[in-house]
Amino acid sequence: MGSYMNKTSVVKVGNVLIGGDNPVVVQSMTDTYTADVEKTVKQILALHKAGSEIVRITVNDESAAAAVPEIVKELAKHDCHVPLVGDFHYNGHTLLSKYPECAKALAKYRINPGNVGFGKKKDTQFAEIIKIAIANDKPVRIGVNWGSLDQALLARLIDENNAQENPLSLQQIMHKALITSALESAKYAEELGLAKDKIIISCKVSEVQDLIAVYQKLAKECGYALHLGLTEAGMGTKGIVASAVSLGILLQQGIGNTIRVSLTPAPNAPRTEEVRVCREILQNLGMRTFTPSVTSCPGCGRTTSSFFRELTSKVKDHLDEKMHTWKEQYHGVEAMKVAVMGCVVNGPGESKNADIGISLPGSGESPVAPVFIDGKKAHTLRGDNISEEFIEIVENYVKNRYGKK
């Protein structure tokens, strides 16, 4: 991992620290109608259980603002104290003023400089939110999106650019406008009295190369904690790959303190998918460990049986299910490496390199499956119960290696 290009401030959001030398934080956002307390609480609990360390909720009208304190109370009944971020557009100043209990209950406010107010009202309405944040000792994310960019600012920069001897391209102007909007807003917030360690900024776009270019420049120009993410990543494989590529490159360069993957969920798909992708990005970069990793081969002509795929799925599902209790009982188990391989070519080698691994027989190979523990052959499995026996061996390994001595 690359070193941080600039040392960022540390921002406390509820019980979570963002920035500085702290681990990159995983965020998510609900898609429920916030005023529906029951559904919103249910989704927040699911997101938090999946590993989201901060959850953002839409606060777009009076019903939503009035529901926020009740949502926090209901979460507490489930022993869930995940910080909630209020997502405000257009009317945040009004809602936070009219519903002071909402302002108190939220752990952070998100403001979009592009729609916090227009014309002469912009600075006034922005200032109202900042003053409420100061009064309640709350941090603020100044989140700029290129889909809702401040048009007055953009027009100003275009006019200035047109007067230059060597004008920038329209794309470069867009990048400059995003960064300028964020930094000018952050500077104004500080002038109003909001401390630097209460400010997080983001400049979100939808294209990978644009995101990389904007954040590389942004990281050089400021010391604020940075929130990373494509503003709309898309659905399925496209959204996952675009997010992994863009966030992976920036994080590897040491840019970014908290991330969200804005996937479009497939119909009836769980909202928690975006959390899983965030965690996989961080774990595969070696920045954090959340759950034991499973190395498995893709299969080839040597592995005509589907059994190794079935076993891989069973092992992964078992590990994911058990981690909710294991992480409390067995310190360090999240770093465990498991291998499930399908033939003799790479099977023994990968299994030896894992903490615990199994090499299943490929086509035409002897119908036995050696199990390796800490690099040494420990068992040989055969017959119809290989799956159950291997999972039992994994269970015993966890207890023996990670249990309290």
Curated annotation (Swiss-Prot):
Alphabetized UniProt keyword annotations: 4Fe-4S, Iron, Iron-sulfur, Isoprene biosynthesis, Metal-binding, Oxidoreductase
Reactions catalysed according to its record:
(2E)-4-hydroxy-3-methylbut-2-enyl diphosphate + oxidized [flavodoxin] + H2O + 2 H(+) = 2-C-methyl-D-erythritol 2,4-cyclic diphosphate + reduced [flavodoxin]
State the needed cofactors, names only: [4Fe-4S] cluster
Q: Where are the transmembrane segments?
A: none
Residues that hold [4Fe-4S] cluster according to the record:
C297, C300, C343, E350
Gene Ontology terms describing biological process: isopentenyl diphosphate biosynthetic process, methylerythritol 4-phosphate pathway; terpenoid biosynthetic process
The record's InterPro entries line, in alphabetical order, gives: Dihydropteroate_synth-like_sf (IPR011005), IspG_bac (IPR016425), IspG_bac-typ (IPR004588), NO2/SO3_Rdtase_4Fe4S_sf (IPR045854)
Its EC number(s): 1.17.7.3
A Pfam entry, by short name: GcpE
GO terms for molecular function, please? 4 iron, 4 sulfur cluster binding; 4-hydroxy-3-methylbut-2-en-1-yl diphosphate synthase activity (ferredoxin); 4-hydroxy-3-methylbut-2-enyl-diphosphate synthase activity (flavodoxin); iron ion binding
User: What is written in the cofactor note of this entry?
Assistant: Binds 1 [4Fe-4S] cluster.
In which pathway is this protein known to take part? Isoprenoid biosynthesis; isopentenyl diphosphate biosynthesis via DXP pathway; isopentenyl diphosphate from 1-deoxy-D-xylulose 5-phosphate: step 5/6
User: What is this protein's function per UniProt?
Assistant: Converts 2C-methyl-D-erythritol 2,4-cyclodiphosphate (ME-2,4cPP) into 1-hydroxy-2-methyl-2-(E)-butenyl 4-diphosphate.
* Family membership: Belongs to the IspG family.
This chain's protein is named: 4-hydroxy-3-methylbut-2-en-1-yl diphosphate synthase (flavodoxin)
